[in-house]
């Protein structure tokens, strides 16, 4: 989502709170919990899942392996739920022509560097760059080239933009910032 006026461009960046992340975290949690439940029921010899008798799964080796996969899956699921609740990767890009300042803000993981805030002068922006890689893992990323700082990505690698969409966004941003556009 973006908001634009004559002198201000504000681009809101969606973080890890996407529908696909919610679905993967839920599926992983339910599957790993079921694995742990089957492994525990095979250890105790009780039938907690009515799909099959507990005597069919021996604790050693099947129950041990299923318990291990269940515990590992619960750890990965808890990691996904934490990134969703912290909304890692969300933030905004603010381009202010009136003040001549560009601000880039992102939320990170908890700790000393939870808030990632970058601030530049517009006169230090050399160009807007599109990096396109074709093939099996095709990706298109929009960068902002800063004098003395290198290239800063403005889009996520997970976003699959069509060539027309990324070119249009780059052209609009380059026109707004009054800098050239490069394609690699």
Curated annotation (Swiss-Prot):
Annotated membrane-spanning segments are 22-42, 57-77
A single GO BP term for this record reads: photosynthesis
- Topologically, how does it sit relative to the membrane? Multi-pass membrane protein
Gene Ontology terms: cellular component: chloroplast thylakoid membrane; photosystem I
Chief localization: plastid
Q: Which UniProt keywords apply?
A: Chloroplast, Membrane, Photosynthesis, Plastid, Thylakoid, Transmembrane, Transmembrane helix
**Cellular location(s):** Plastid, Chloroplast thylakoid membrane
Q: What job does this protein perform?
A: Seems to be required for the assembly of the photosystem I complex.
Similarity remark = Belongs to the Ycf4 family.
Q: What is this protein called?
A: Photosystem I assembly protein Ycf4
The organism is Pelargonium hortorum
